[in-house]
Amino acid sequence: MGRNVKTKAKRKNKKKAEASSSEIPSIPTRVWQPGVDTLEDGEELQCDPSAYNSLHGFHVGWPCLSFDILGDKLGLNRTEFPHTLYMVAGTQAEKAAHNSIGLFKITNVSGKRRDVVPKTFGNGEDEDEDDEDDSDSDDDDGDEASKTPNIQVRRVAHHGCVNRIRAMPQNSHICVSWADSGHVQVWDMSSHLNALAESETEGKDGTSPVLNQAPLVNFSGHKDEGYAIDWSPATAGRLLSGDCKSMIHLWEPASGSWAVDPIPFAGHTASVEDLQWSPAEENVFASCSVDGSVAVWDIRLGKSPALSFKAHNADVNVISWNRLASCMLASGSDDGTFSIRDLRLIKGGDAVVAHFEYHKHPITSIEWSAHEASTLAVTSGDNQLTIWDLSLEKDEEEEAEFNAQTKELVNTPQDLPPQLLFVHQGQKDLKELHWHNQIPGMIISTAGDGFNILMPYNIQNTLPSELPA
């Protein structure tokens, strides 16, 4: 199930040089920028493994528009390789009857263990020492097969494409799916997860048959299909679902099932694209819409938004509410821009604390890190996954010193935002990303050609176990 992953690193010309390297003057490497630079005939981009602590790619058959990482009992803040993780994903098959929900157990996720990233650009001796440290890895010994993740899967039949799927944070075996048929269904996946946890061979290499299972709830009260759905992090079982007709329904747990309020929240004038419960107030949630607005609602105050504001000049595709700084809400638009707002400033006027126009295609996913309040990741239709640290600011003196030290090695673009921390490529038609809440620094992304698991090298210095004792 593995595949070769090619991502941004450096340009490689396939043409053989006729002269030896000693006869050719050293030419500084030029950073290749997607959307700005083009590849010439015979050139290709290749992955630079040193940019990652871990990088793996795999596919599961049909593409998956949406997935979620499942909470497990393997421990918090895990930093030791190899890693094990669980996830749920829904397919987008050619025929409605061929779709399924997959429960995945992924083991042997290998990677490198490094020392803390140096605070400054060191001298030659420091770099040599760092290189030696970088070569030390939990997984450097042995053949390539020993470094390949093992994937086990159990599949449950799902009629229609899965537009979005989410696992309840308090009970990750309970999942909800939004189907393109217009149905919202809640599932109990405990038997499948137990089977995966107890066996090393169950569903290995994707050989699991598609099983038939009835959902706990099958809600057909929406007037159209939808994508927006979110579980409450504060009240177990409380759920929201929003559709393409601009309506939002509230679900409340009731006697082992759910009671869905038949009267929807109404305030948007076009499709509701995403929903996010407040991480701090159990009765408050936010929504975004094709109408270009973001609305904040209080379920105690009726069916109209408590406040609403124009967020972008195009469709607002996705939002993410910062779990570590609950005043911060990020939004991503169809025009490729994304913004961060301080909700405390909404009523006073301009609440935008950051706005980025780096991406040139629609933003398809945005999510704050679960471990760093200033860090978030974004996916876009330009086939880039970018990671941003809002705490970073441009330091003219430091930048000049760095450029002086590296000018013979690399030509650094001058127009990159200082908050841009990492760019990952290699996937086509990126749809969604999630940070792993229990493995700091790990991101999983899904695209039209499969999944990637990545842990960028330059964010590893925030990991608890990597800090000096």
Swiss-Prot record:
WD repeats lie at residues 157-197, 221-261, 267-307, 311-351, 358-398, 425-464. Residues 124-143 have a biased composition (Acidic residues). Residues 1-15 have a biased composition (Basic residues). Induction: Accumulates in response to heat stress. InterPro entries: Glutamate-rich_WD_repeat (IPR051972), Histone-bd_RBBP4-like_N (IPR022052), WD40/YVTN_repeat-like_dom_sf (IPR015943), WD40_repeat_dom_sf (IPR036322), WD40_rpt (IPR001680). Residues 1-29, 115-150 are annotated as: Disordered. Probable substrate receptor of CRL4 E3 ligase complexes acting as negative regulators of thermotolerance by disturbing the action of HSP90-1 and by preventing the expression of heat-inducible genes (e.g. HSP14.7, HSP21, At2g03020 and WRKY28). This is Protein HEAT STRESS TOLERANT DWD 1. It comes from Arabidopsis thaliana (Mouse-ear cress).
